[in-house]
Amino acid sequence: MDEGVNLVFHKKVIDGTAIKRLISRLIDHFGMAHTSHILDQVKTLGFQQATATSISLGIDDLLTIPSKGWLVQDAEQQSLSLEKHHHYGNVHAVEKLRQSIEVWYATSEYLRQEMNPNFRMTDPFNPVHIMSFSGARGNASQVHQLVGMRGLMSDPQGQMIDLPIQSNLREGLSLTEYIISCYGARKGVVDTAVRTSDAGYLTRRLVEVVQHIVVRRTDCGTLRGISVSPRRMPERIFIQTLIGRVLADDIYIGSRCIAIRNQDIGIGLVNRFITFRIQPISIRTPFTCRSTSWICRLCYGRSPTHGDLVELGEAVGIIAGQSIGEPGTQLTLRTFHTGGVFTGGTAEHVRAPSNGKIKFNFNEALVHPARTRHGHPALLCSMDLDVTIESEDILHNLTIPPKSFLLVQNNQYVESEQVIAEICAGTSTFHFKERVRKHIYSDSEGEMHWSTDVYHAPEFTYSNVHLLPKTSHLWILSGGSCRSRGAPFSLHKDQDQMNPRSTERERRYLSSLSANNDQIRYKFFSSSFSGKKKDDRSPGYSEMNRIICTLHCNLIYPSILRENSDLLAKRRRNRLVIPVQSSQEREKELIPHSGISIELPINGIFRKKSILAFFDDPRYRTKSSGITQYETMGMHSIVKKEGLVDYRGINEFKPKYQMTIDRFFFIPEEVHILPESSSIMVRNNSLIGVDTRIALNTRSRAGGLVRVERKKRGIALQIFSGTIHFPGETDKISWDSGILIPPGTGKRNSKESKKWKNGIYVQRITPTKKKHFVLFRPVVTYEIADGLNLARLFPPDLCQEKDNMQLQIVNYIVYGNGKPIREISDTSIQLVRTWFILNWDQDKKSASAEAAHASFVEVRAKGLIRDFLRIDLVKSPILDPRKRNDPSGSGLISDNVSDHTNINPFYSKPKMKQSPRQNHGTIRTLLNQNKECPSLMILSASNCFRMGPFNDVKSQNVIKESIKKDAIIQIRNSIGPLGTALQVVNFDSFYYFITHNQVLLTKYLQVENLKQTFQVLQYYLMDESGRIYNPDPRSNIVLNSFNLSWYFLPHNNYENSCEEISTIVSLGQFICENGCIAKNGPYLRSGQVLIVQLDSVVIRSAKPYLATPGATVHGHYGEILYDGDTVVTFLYEKSRSGDITQGLPKVEQVLEVRSVDSISVNLEKRVENWNEHITRILGFPWGFLIGAELTIVQSRISLVNKIQKVYRSQGVQIHNRHIEIIVRQITSKVLVSEDGMSNVFLPRELIGLLRAERTGRALEESICYKAFLLGITRTSLNTQSFISEASFQETARVLAKAALRGRIDWLKGLKENVVIGGMIPVGTGFKGLVHCSKQHKSIPKNKHFFEGEIRDILFHHRELFDSCISKNFHDTPEQSFRVFNDS
């Protein structure tokens, strides 16, 4: 050793970092040889000591941290309260997830920080502790898993599993924790194998991009540099960045120059810079080097191996590629993995320095209310906000940076160390964030509502995807729906009688719905879907809807016929069909063959002369095919076609034919339609007997004459029963095809006269040209009766005409004269149907009544529920489309009656005295504006009566049971409207709810300053098990009694309670759990108000989902969602876990410029904006150049930072220079745009930026181009050497293209020379290849004005562009361009 050096004796513990510093200082002082000698001695000493004091690792050395218990408990407490808020609808799923991740991450981090002091205090020489900080194996995070907690894990995709592993490996994991843990650990093992090859391939591609970059000059003469400021970055990174670089400018302190341009920076100079806190320092980097395909010594800086400037001929490109690729290989091979443990970041907080009152300037320009990313309310600062905290003896001043969230109110008292603000992590920290979609699925089935307007997503104008403009709740209102399990496929046409056997599958499903199978009978209706004749082969799918009835009803619960959407216009939509039957018939057979079916339009409005009901008389029913014949042809149309008024298209009565005759005839025949391929076993015109085999699996049911016809679709085989007669010459038979001989007109003396008492049908048949014979076929005669006795079906007051409402009875024959009727699969055919047509007189009083309104009413009489159909001539403001938005008439109830119980528009005014002794059933009418419209009832209870309009009737309070306050009573197994066991005081409010129409009544109610839109459903009907059926046009909802809860409001007397309610609850309003309805405490379940009564509220339970702006809502308003359907999708940014196994693909993503994460997307946008604005400001020739330059500079710095971030997070140090060389190659191309045509380059051709710039200068014309980011693979395939490209990928394509274009390879790179066996131009082979060009020295340096200006524009943006624009470009174009190039 050199004796002259004064050696200092240090006594302190040295770690890896200190050793590195020591070695670099030794090299500076003594050079390489001496240093290696010293280090050899250190190595020997280390091995001796390690052998003497060796340590072993045992399970007893793993000491757990004492504070772990309460930390975990605290985190669990926070998670629990978070879960509650989510349940109440205060935070949405993403906020919940994000916050729970941060809570557990913070807990885990805190434990990790506790670990070190804990070891230091209790056992400083613990082997685990020593090992984790020696740098040999393992690090703090791995030891933390052994003694702290494992924490949150990532799944194989790098997503976070939000169930943390609370145990550490010392305590042992539970089963669930073990399975979650296996995700990450398995991932580590697999990654080790797979990623090694990835890292190797990455290295190969990197080297491919930069293999030709060699140091070939000493100085390229550039004046540019990149400024580095010590204030903007941590000291360690600042030192790393500067050491080994070359200054681009002189550095002054005041007037004294402390470093000159082109001086390389050592550790001494860096320390001086840090001490003097110098302004930004400008350094030269590979980015600023002006040479096109190589690099100069000064722009590269010091050689990484020894501390001098890099030598000429050094292959720095290959060194750079290897330096970036190699750590990836090495890192994936580290076996001690963190095992997929999630690492993220926590937000910075500003805490109060002491207790006191906080004050700030509460100005709307400075702060405005917002939600934090965890869903807490906060104030967002738009600029720096000064906050003062006044404690008893001192004032603290704090400044809160812009875009931070203030978590306290003005003048609030804060405690010491309380968090008062959350600092937003700016874009300067390049977290790996990615945009993730999070789907929220419904956990119960029900109906969807939302409480705000929504936008349609622009690309899905007609779909069910909506965007939310502001924060609001989505509600899933509870209720199940009847949907059949099997495919609801039916072959039956409209109005067919259906065979019971064909519906067994649905029947089995239905019976499971009902509580008591014996009482339930079903009738099915399939919707009609027979389209045009062409579509006969493909019948659509239709849903079979159920009509469910129970014994105590007189009307059967209706359901809606659903239609195929494409046949809507032609079908009988908008109808409810309700069969009305007596219960004796119902018990005899499963599907009764007779009975009245009532047809209701969906919106409940009848026009004049529309069909109210129809009746299928079982006497006019036949089981066989045949032909109908009328005796006389006289008939006339009952109804003229009227224009349809309502936009929903109510069907008025179709003009059928009213018979002026009293009988018609039906000629039966047997028809079989067989496919063309089938083999027929009988001949045409042959006679067969009963049960003869006519095809392979078909037998005849009747005997007679066989006719076989071939048709397009198959073979029609008809069997006519009857007698054959060969006519003699005396018999005169007309040559018509068929004659009907009515009964009593045949020959009296004939032998066959006995057979003819019913009449015969004579048909002439000519099998051959010569002979013909006559077939006599039997005829069935149907007499048409006078009609049904109405008194048998309806109460007597219906038939009296004083009500202005009449029922006309019309019989019509379903099939036309002479039309053949075909039966389908053993179903019977109805020949005559009786229509009941609703009509009313146009009195002067009711002249305004264009339509009647039908609704269902459910009435209690002595514990029995009866349902009635009620038809009023009410002109309702809601039903009239012109008056639908009229605020005055907001319900069916008139507003004229002055009564104190007017709580809200849904509350009815007239009340009713009930005297149970006199009447068993009561029904009330609704009053309209005239107060004189009578109403019509179809009631099956004979002892009901109708009450006229009445005023001033006072209501008694009938509820005498003592009800506990704020009790929620579940409605179960009790009878009454909506299943209530108590008598409902105010029936009309409930009644309104039942009869209200499915009109989107959108009222904005001001409730607790919350605007709500709501929609009241049409009506609910309830069966015995407490289910409520809602015949909604879109689906049938079944509400269970479990889904409803009563909520009783306390009341002292009648008047006060009404006033109280009027401020709080209104019908259709949504109430969140924990919200207050009454003064006596919060409500316990979320839901929608169904019924408002004087002292109680019935609430339908609902589940709220909070959604923030930008979320996507799936499904339409009011749509039925099933369990597991997607309700809403959130788009949010989250950071990926920072394991190197994610890190390597990230590096690759950045280098291949794949725009997967939000950052590269932002870069692309930034690039486009720059290009646009700069060209507009500066005009063309400068605009393209400066636009492209600035874009490239921006993106280069950003890319370097991103790649460094990944490696630094793994503790890997790579010098920026290496990354810069790579990034310079992938950003050095520009794309020739198609706008400006140039003579030199093809449109969309990729050329180097410097080449574009020089060509433009030589041609003195503008070339349009824009900056373009290439990935490393594409860069390798876009080089100047086609030999290099061909040896990398796609050999045949590259060579073919090069041959076609006649490309020349100048053999400048290493690879080309290796391939053809020449000398490579690096190291010793460098000297003979490079001829120093003297041309650039001859160009005089023109110290033009332009130089300084352009430099300012490019890098400091200090001055506006006016100065360059104001000068004339064309004075000295060559010089100015040349100078720009030098600069």
From Swiss-Prot:
InterPro entries: DNA-dir_RpoC2_beta_pp, RNA_pol_beta''_euk, RNA_pol_Rpb1_3_sf, RNA_pol_Rpb1_4, RNA_pol_Rpb1_5, Rpb1_funnel_sf. Keywords: Chloroplast, DNA-directed RNA polymerase, Metal-binding, Nucleotidyltransferase, Plastid, Transcription, Transferase, Zinc. It is found in: Plastid, Chloroplast. It catalyses: RNA(n) + a ribonucleoside 5'-triphosphate = RNA(n+1) + diphosphate. One of its GO terms (cellular component) is chloroplast. Zn(2+) binds at C220, C289, C296, C299. One of its GO terms (molecular function) is DNA-directed RNA polymerase activity. Its cofactor is Zn(2+). The keyword Flavoprotein does not apply. Coiled coil: none annotated. The keyword Plastid applies. It is an enzyme of class 2 (transferase). PANTHER family: DNA-DIRECTED RNA POLYMERASE SUBUNIT BETA (PTHR34995:SF1). DNA-dependent RNA polymerase catalyzes the transcription of DNA into RNA using the four ribonucleoside triphosphates as substrates. In plastids the minimal PEP RNA polymerase catalytic core is composed of four subunits: alpha, beta, beta', and beta''. When a (nuclear-encoded) sigma factor is associated with the core the holoenzyme is formed, which can initiate transcription. Belongs to the RNA polymerase beta' chain family. RpoC2 subfamily. This is DNA-directed RNA polymerase subunit beta''. The gene is rpoC2.
